[in-house]
Amino acid sequence: MEIIFYHPTFNAAWWVNALEKALPHARVREWKVGDNNPADYALVWQPPVEMLAGRRLKAVFVLGAGVDAILSKLNAHPEMLDASIPLFRLEDTGMGLQMQEYAASQVLHWFRRFDDYQALKNQALWKPLPEYTREEFSVGIIGAGVLGAKVAESLQAWGFPLRCWSRSRKSWPGVESYVGREELRAFLNQTRVLINLLPNTAQTVGIINSELLDQLPDGAYVLNLARGVHVQEADLLAALDSGKLKGAMLDVFSQEPLPQESPLWRHPRVAMTPHIAAVTRPAEAIDYISRTITQLEKGEPVTGQVDRARGY
């Protein structure tokens, strides 16, 4: 079994060695320009077109949970990968726990009004504030995939009312499910904290805009853990300035790194991190990839395959 590996920043030698330990019958090599030798599987992140074009691969694994970048490249260069070759994304591989940590800590930060107390500290004001109640702090998750389910699971322990919105009905314990555009308004009207975990598709670009934000309760919060292109940043800032939104926590942006001139840097009710909410953890990624390849070789059912038509 031949496996080729390409990632512009990962330590390729470490990955090659770890993969060969996990798959003793495989030969793994780092792909370099000019390498046209046969391969059965490819592990990639932002691969050049020529790496995959013309290859008769059994499968391609994208070294991350998001597949929007490679799907965009495939649309622009259909010769890059035959439509019959399955494409897999990393399914959890430690990202679920990271998302749970990030989302739960931020919801609790807002719930306990730590943002307000920080603002009071900056003014040297000693002023206890009224508490929020859990009943008035409903959390709504848009994007009900693997990571959305993990986030909902982590928040259940804290007793917040939970709801999710997605393309298909979910039956998660303790979570109210909303489906499609026709149920979006009802979902938003009672959502105090909106957590975005949507995939990046043509249908979801710019979805967090003034029309959507206006349907949230006054004083709501937005937590974006998915993609920056989901948010119309000017609309978000306007909602913060008007008081419609009380705060926003952003891990992703339409342009990364975020330009120095962006007003998001200076807005007092915007907190941010540099796209670190859930990163690829090599050991867990290798465990998932090696297990999935073994299942594919045995003809067993697998999970994590990308639906190219849907975009995730």
UniProtKB/Swiss-Prot annotation:
- Sample GO molecular function, one term: hydroxypyruvate reductase (NADPH) activity
Q: Top enzyme class of this protein?
A: oxidoreductase
UniProt-annotated catalytic positions: 227, 275 (proton donor)
Query: Could you say which EC number(s) this protein's record lists?
Result: 1.1.1.79, 1.1.1.81
Q: Which reaction does it catalyse?
A: glycolate + NADP(+) = glyoxylate + NADPH + H(+); (R)-glycerate + NAD(+) = 3-hydroxypyruvate + NADH + H(+); (R)-glycerate + NADP(+) = 3-hydroxypyruvate + NADPH + H(+)
Q: Which domain of life does the UniProt lineage start with?
A: Bacteria
Q: Alphabetically list the UniProt keywords.
A: Cytoplasm, NAD, NADP, Oxidoreductase
Q: Which InterPro entries match?
A: D-isomer_DH_NAD-bd, GhrA_Enterobacterales, NAD(P)-bd_dom_sf
Gene Ontology CC terms, in alphabetical order: cytoplasm
Where is it localised?
A: Cytoplasm
**What residue intervals traverse the membrane?**
none
NCBIfam families from the xrefs?
PRK15469.1
What exactly does this protein do?
Catalyzes the NADPH-dependent reduction of glyoxylate and hydroxypyruvate into glycolate and glycerate, respectively.
Q: Return the PANTHER family for the record.
A: 2-HACID_DH_C DOMAIN-CONTAINING PROTEIN, D-ISOMER SPECIFIC 2-HYDROXYACID DEHYDROGENASE NAD-BINDING DOMAIN-CONTAINING PROTEIN
Q: Which family does it belong to?
A: Belongs to the D-isomer specific 2-hydroxyacid dehydrogenase family. GhrA subfamily.
User: What is the name listed in the Swiss-Prot or TrEMBL entry for this protein?
Assistant: Glyoxylate/hydroxypyruvate reductase A
The source organism is: Salmonella typhi
- What gene is it encoded by? ghrA
